[in-house]
Structure formats: C-alpha cells, structure tokens
C-alpha cells in the first residue's frame, strides 16, 4: 500500500464531498466548489466524515495513482476551506508590476509592457510595485499562473534581475575576468 494513499482524508466542518459513479469528485466548501475526474483504477469513497482512497490491483500505474489521487483530493479539501497562495518578487531597476482592472501589467525591461489576464477562480494582488500574490482554491491553477508570470522574465544568472518566487535562491554566475 502507498504510505500516502492509505491515509484517510478528514473532512472538516462546512465541507461537503461527493463522489459520482464515474469517479468525479466534487468538493464544496466555504470559498467555492472544485470538481475533478479521476481514473477508474482507484476507488474513492466517503465514510464517517472521511475520504478513503483504495486501488484495485497492484501494478505500477495503480500504485502511482493511489497516492497521487489521495494528495489531489486532500489539496481540494484544503483549497475550498483555506485556499492557496504563491508570492512572487520582482528584482531589477525599473522593473515593476501594476494592476489595471482584471489585468496584471508587468514592466520588466522589454520595449513594451506585458499584460496577463486574471483567470477565473484566481486572484492576483500587487503589493507595492515589486510583489505579486497569486491566490485561489485550486492548487494546480495557482501554481500554473505563478509559473506563467515568472516565465515572463526569469531571473538571469549573472545579476539576478527578473521575477522569482518569494524565498527562491538564485545562484549567480561569475562574470568574465578582464585582460591584464
């Protein structure tokens, strides 16, 4: 048995979990409702205020999906109650971020400002002009939006300028040594 997969998921108060016969899990909470379809090689059932994930066989794919399914459902339950957030920092002279309506506008050294649309279910907040916070209930979506923002201008290896996750350590390379 998978060490992660065999652990039951406690359902907190105010959260409702439903499993349809075709393995679609719907988690309804105080913030929103999340829905995801899982492959039929795992069995998902709700018993005694807990979600229990089991698998049919013991081949490699079923073992892998057992723990993965349990982790995704646990993240769905956490997402509808607390939510998830990723923080990004902008480092560089003249680099800044601003919010215009539902758009995030990044000035990060290009000849034009880069605009990123806010996705449904995701909230983008700009603190100051060099800190971006991405919030939402779906952990996968929050991470993907944050990665898309970071990809606009990844930290460069020589000066460290660019967009990075909060707490991310960028290893800087040493520049060329001049002629003597």
Swiss-Prot record:
The lineage of its organism: Bacteria, Bacillati, Bacillota, Clostridia, Thermoanaerobacterales. This protein binds to the 23S rRNA, and is important in its secondary structure. It is located near the subunit interface in the base of the L7/L12 stalk, and near the tRNA binding site of the peptidyltransferase center. One of its GO terms (molecular function) is rRNA binding. NCBIfam families: L6_bact. GO terms for biological process: cytoplasmic translation. The keyword Flavoprotein does not apply. SUPFAM superfamilies: Ribosomal protein L6. It comes from Thermoanaerobacter pseudethanolicus (strain ATCC 33223 / 39E). It comes from the Bacteria. PANTHER family: 60S/50S RIBOSOMAL PROTEIN L6/L9 (PTHR11655), LARGE RIBOSOMAL SUBUNIT PROTEIN UL6M (PTHR11655:SF14). InterPro entries: Ribosomal_uL6-like, Ribosomal_uL6-like_a/b-dom_sf, Ribosomal_uL6_a/b-dom, Ribosomal_uL6_bac-type. Part of the 50S ribosomal subunit. Keywords: Ribonucleoprotein, Ribosomal protein, RNA-binding, rRNA-binding. This is Large ribosomal subunit protein uL6. Belongs to the universal ribosomal protein uL6 family. HAMAP family: Ribosomal_uL6_B. One of its GO terms (cellular component) is cytosolic large ribosomal subunit.
């Amino acid at each position: 048995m998978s060490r992660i997969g065999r652990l039951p998921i406690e359902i907190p108060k105010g959260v409702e979990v439903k499993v349809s016969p075709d393995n679609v899990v719907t988690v309804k909470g105080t913030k929103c409702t999340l829905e995801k379809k899982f492959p039929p090689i795992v069995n998902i059932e709700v018993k005694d205020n807990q979600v229990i994930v089991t698998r049919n066989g013991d081949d490699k794919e079923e073992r892998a999906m057992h723990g993965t399914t349990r982790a995704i459902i646990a993240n769905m339950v956490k997402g509808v109650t607390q939510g998830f957030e990723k923080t990004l920092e902008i480092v560089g002279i003249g680099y800044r971020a601003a919010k215009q309506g539902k758009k995030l506008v990044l000035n990060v050294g290009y000849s034009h400002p880069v605009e990123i649309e806010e996705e449904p279910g995701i909230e983008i907040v700009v603190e100051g002009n060099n800190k971006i916070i991405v919030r939402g209930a779906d952990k996968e979506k929050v991470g993907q939006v944050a990665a898309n923002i970071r990809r606009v201008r990844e930290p460069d290896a020589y000066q460290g300028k660019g967009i990075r996750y909060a707490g991310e350590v960028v290893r800087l390379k040493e520049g060329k040594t001049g002629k003597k």
